[in-house]
Swiss-Prot record:
It comes from Haemophilus parahaemolyticus. Its EC number is 2.1.1.72. The keyword S-adenosyl-L-methionine applies. It holds the Pfam family N6_N4_Mtase. This is Type II methyltransferase M.HhaII.
């Protein structure tokens, strides 16, 4: 078992490991902000799309899925490792936006939803009625909640249009949107966490903004950084 002093050896690498194991390395109040894109089934279970296991549905279905209990476990750890005033950027789909994410926050009293952004992917996806063209980023802040001293850019709209130039991962996220959020809420050298990194877009943003990254993915990552 690793100890907290070992976590620096995992910084700025594509670690291939379970996110919960990564949390065990990180000491309390060490992370400035975090991104989390949980691999929940959500709308897929409700809609029962026929393309699951075929084409792009095959990629999505192959990813390990997180139960609500596992997601809550991650949220509990975010509360522990975030610095006071730190932000958690939580990606959700339309189903979880409508149903609400508050049950995931029941055991984390110092975390509060303070804002939300919509990512217009400029590409139409699935849907029996309206077709999916967007994803949602819930902005959660750790107490004490403050806006002016923790969010320094004020040109970020709450609807962000960005089409992916390439898609190395089935859940790829917008580089420029995430980069602007990093610039708004952190300083150079700060530590940024993504324990379900997927295509490692947050890592790329950190490299472009001179921030330190700590993150991992259970499936994706460099084999030389794989942890049992």
């Amino acid at each position: 078992m690793f100890s907290h002093q070992d976590y620096l050896s995992f910084v700025n690498k594509k670690n291939k490991m379970n996110g919960i194991d990564l949390f065990k390395l990180i000491p309390d109040k060490a992370v400035k902000i975090a991104f989390f894109d949980p691999q929940y089934r959500g709308v897929l279970d409700k809609m029962s799309y026929g393309n699951e296991g075929k084409g792009r549905g095959k990629e999505r279905a192959a990813l390990p899925q997180m139960t609500d209990e596992i997601i809550q476990q991650f949220i509990n750890e975010f509360e522990r490792v975030l610095l006071p005033n730190g932000y958690l950027f939580l990606w959700v789909d339309k189903f979880h936006l409508v149903e609400g994410v508050k049950p995931w926050l029941e055991n984390t009293p110092s975390l509060s939803v303070v804002d939300m952004l919509t990512w217009d992917k400029q590409k139409i996806g699935m849907g029996y009625r309206t077709r999916r063209r967007s994803e949602y980023l819930v902005v959660i802040q750790k107490e004490p909640k403050k806006a002016k001293i923790t969010w320094t850019l004020h040109n970020i709209p709450d609807v962000w249009a960005e089409k992916l130039q390439s898609k190395p991962h089935t859940h790829s996220k917008p580089i420029e949107m995430q980069k602007q959020l990093i610039l708004a809420t952190t300083q150079e050298g700060d530590l940024i966490l993504d324990p379900a990194s997927g295509g490692y877009s947050v890592f790329e943003c950190c490299k472009q903004t001179n921030r330190n990254f700590i993150g991992c993915d259970l499936i994706f990552g460099d084999d030389e950084n794989e942890q049992d």
